């Protein structure tokens, strides 16, 4: 992998990740852009203890432009985009309309491919590995920013999810705090460790799932299953079999196997609802250990956390979506219409032949 860092016309960072070591990236952003002014602010809820990012400038962000005006496609002639070069393998840049900025963190856009009409599932294993390497490098770089405590790599896919750009891409949020979801896992981890005399909860969950009937896919270094208490109609958790706290901890064997396993999962998701159905909308979310101090979680260290990817769709059946209504939105109690055992069975049924 070759990495080339440059700047866009308004000063935002752009990083190219290339498969070939001899690739030259010297194109200049010719757009007359002024420096981005953001209004990102993080406010803490005194009752719930969680945080809300207030970012009113995002109301003016680009919304479903036609393909020939896509800001994530390479620049061609007089059609200038966020990517100044006429081609790229993987490109990452600071979001022009960030939810988090300055002391409130940082937001980046990850372009998986220059092919506007592709999806992650269409990538070659070599290209998917390059995306993994880009995620890993950005996790490392962002973790060193003084305001950053946790790095979150994710992909929203599909208009039903709320995606505003059709080009295949993901995002990275670098938070200035430990997120509430991660804090819950760390508290459970600490309680289990204390109650069992040191047993790791992630290890116990993975062992139990691998011995059960909700396994979807298992390789030499990765395992995917539908969790016992899945929140979503079709939800899969993908774990490396060797526990590591973040993407940086993956060894070469796990990195090599990841593309094959992950691409197969994504392709199965597109087959869940049968032939003739539109692509399945999904969210893919990497859970990594925070880089900040963990004194709040007694007895827990970063190495106790287990890196894993959560992949789920909000489509519960053909033509119908799972909405977060009263119980979910008001009380945070999920109602799942699809038994996890049936979801796992269906995901095994649609395996590639």
Label the model's feature ranges.
Residues 1-353:
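HIT superfamily nucleotide-processing domains
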């Amino acid at each position: 992998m070759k990495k080339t860092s440059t700047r866009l016309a308004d000063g935002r960072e752009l990083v190219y990740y290339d498969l070939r070591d001899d690739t030259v990236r010297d194109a200049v952003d010719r757009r007359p852009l002024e420096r981005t002014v953001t209004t990102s602010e993080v406010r803490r809820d005194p009752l719930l203890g969680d945080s809300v990012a207030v970012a009113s400038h995002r109301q003016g962000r680009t919304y479903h432009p036609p393909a020939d005006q896509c800001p994530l496609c390479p620049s061609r002639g007089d059609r200038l985009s966020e990517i100044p070069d006429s081609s790229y393998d993987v490109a990452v840049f600071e979001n022009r309309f960030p939810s988090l900025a300055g002391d409130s963190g940082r937001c980046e856009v990850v372009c998986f491919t220059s092919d506007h009409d592709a999806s992650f599932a269409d990538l070659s294993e070599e290209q998917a590995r390059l995306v993994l390497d880009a995620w890993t490098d950005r996790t490392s770089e962002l973790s060193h920013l003084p305001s950053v405590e946790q790095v979150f790599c994710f992909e929203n896919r599909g208009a039903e999810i709320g995606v505003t750009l059709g080009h295949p891409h993901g995002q990275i949020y670098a938070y200035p705090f430990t997120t509430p979801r991660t804090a819950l896992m760390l508290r459970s981890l600490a309680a289990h460790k204390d109650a069992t005399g040191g047993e790791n909860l992630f290890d116990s969950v993975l062992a139990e799932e691998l011995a059960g009937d909700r396994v979807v896919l298992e390789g030499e270094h990765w395992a995917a299953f539908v969790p016992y208490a899945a929140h979503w109609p079709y939800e899969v958790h993908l774990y490396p079999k060797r526990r590591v706290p973040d993407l940086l901890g993956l060894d070469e064997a796990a990195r090599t196997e990841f593309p094959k396993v992950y691409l197969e999962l994504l392709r199965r998701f597109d087959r869940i609802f049968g032939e003739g159905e539109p692509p399945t909308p999904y969210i893919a979310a990497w859970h990594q250990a925070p880089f900040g101090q963990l004194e709040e979680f007694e007895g827990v260290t970063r190495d106790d956390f287990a890196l894993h990817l959560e992949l789920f769709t909000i489509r519960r059946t053909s033509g119908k979506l799972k909405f977060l209504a009263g119980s979910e939105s008001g009380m945070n109690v999920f109602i799942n219409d699809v038994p996890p055992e049936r979801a796992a069975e269906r995901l095994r049924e649609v395996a590639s032949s």
